[in-house]
Amino acid sequence: MTDLAMTVVVAAPQKIMPSLSALAAYLDEVGTTIVSRDKCPVPTTLQHRRSCELWRISATKGELSRSRLAAIGNELKIDINLQSSEQRLRDYRLAVFDMDSTLIECEVIDLLAERAGVGERVATITERAMRGEIDFDQSFKERLGLLKGLSSDVLDELLNNLPFVEGGSELMLSLRSLGIKTVIVSGGFDVFASHVASVLGMDGYLANTLAIADGRLTGEAVMPIVNANTKREQLLTLAHELGVTAEQSIAVGDGANDLAMLGAAGLGVAFHAKPVVRAQADYQVSHTGLDSLLYFLGHRGELAQ
């Protein structure tokens, strides 16, 4: 039996919400009563390309399937998530984010590889690592080794042209106004994490050190590597330092090395994630921007504009 007080959060990447008859039909199929259907406010800066609805439901006779809801959403190219009242009303105090392909629309190590002339080789390894097909630490060392000798001059060029994910600035502004601490914990590089955290107004970052000597990348990994276990442990450490429980944390990521972190958080969100991550995460955002996380914080009042 499904929780008697739940919310279906629907977010679309356009101003006009498409027909949700397929969603209504599925809810009816499992004996769900739709108590209310309301529009959810979206950030002013995104009003021309975002819409959100909250369907409050109760008295579900059958078991609601998150994967079925996600599949309906994928057909409509929108995001549909099921949230319990307890999670919706929880006092979140910490939000931890992956960086590459989560806060920025690229994998930095792949961009560096392109400049080094080994783009295809590194991109293939990156994709396999993010799908969880190969060990992250070994793949990181292998990819980094291929960058040996690359001039550090390319760093400023890349830093000045990083493509930020839509909704990121709106999300951070609102989280900051709510007093939620925001931190990057990335398997990428510190020089980029520092820049991204600064641009978005985040509270801190942890990432791998990019070793440089005589103006060139050394190709050597600086230990310890920020991997899946590091991400999980850092989330737990940050929560402890804030004096809150892990359940009061939000975690967001896209790759297999984010799964442990997502599982440790009270609200783990697979963001435009690889299939292995979507299959294991309770929440997934695949069609809209980072602002969609705000629609899971329903008790917090108006969004910061």
Q: For each of these PLM feature ranges, what is it?
A:
Residues 67, 149, 154-267, 271-305:
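C-terminal cap/substrate-recognition subdomain and adjoining C-terminal extension
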Residues 92-108, 254-257, 262:
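Asp-based phosphoryl-transfer active-site loop
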